[in-house]
Regions:
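Nucleic-acid substrate recognition interfaces
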Residues: 1-198
Length: 198
């Protein structure tokens, strides 16, 4: 039997654009939340979650076959697609939760405790393996994160503690799951992995 666990790896203090990346991601989530609140009636008519997500993405992302209704791509140029999709999912979840809470509040007849949709958020970006996060060669205590430097999305090398990397190398079974990033006050990469059966 295999157990799924996670392990937080603290990054050493480094000169990488962590704050800029966090700020642009949270701005994107706030902008999308505002858009999806405006068009919620339209989105709520789509019962299938995957189809609703696709419709939400088509509203903000222009392709050859789809001109977007809103200017997300102009406001957040070159945002990696996986990060854009994570922001869309977060915003959809926030608006959906708000709408459900509002409906329940209205049915209750209470005057106090009216739900509020927060545009300022504490969303944390997800770094998907290979497109937003990749490891250095075996034996090196480094990884690469795709971060926003204020102008463009670039790969930045992050140095990890040797003991953390040894633990991860020992316990990762080869099937690595998506790493997440950031916690208030410190920077962490939490990598979910399957613990090898002894």
């Amino acid at each position: 039997m295999q157990t799924v666990s996670s392990y937080g790896v603290e990054l050493r203090k480094q000169n990488i654009p962590v704050r800029q990346t966090l700020e642009i991601y949270r701005s994107a989530v706030s902008y999308l939340t505002e858009i999806y609140e405006q068009v919620w009636e339209e989105l709520a008519e789509i019962p299938d979650a995957k189809r609703r997500f696709n419709a939400a993405e088509h509203l903000v992302h222009t392709t050859k076959k789809n001109p977007a209704r809103f200017d997300f791509d102009l406001r957040f140029p070159k945002m990696p697609s996986y990060l854009r999709r994570a922001a869309i999912q977060h915003a959809l979840g926030s608006v959906s939760s708000y709408e459900i809470r509002m409906e329940l509040w209205e049915k209750s007849g209470k005057k106090a405790g009216k739900p509020r949709l927060a545009y300022e958020n504490h969303a944390m970006p997800v770094f998907y393996r290979d497109v937003m996060y990749r490891e250095e060669k075996e034996g090196k205590d480094e990884a690469y994160l795709k971060l926003y430097d204020g102008h463009d999305w670039k790969w930045f090398c992050v140095h990890l503690n040797h003991t953390d990397m040894e633990y991860l190398r020992k316990n990762w079974s080869g099937k690595r799951h998506q790493p997440r990033h950031w916690r208030k006050g410190t920077i962490n990469i939490s990598c979910v992995f399957l613990i090898r059966k002894k």
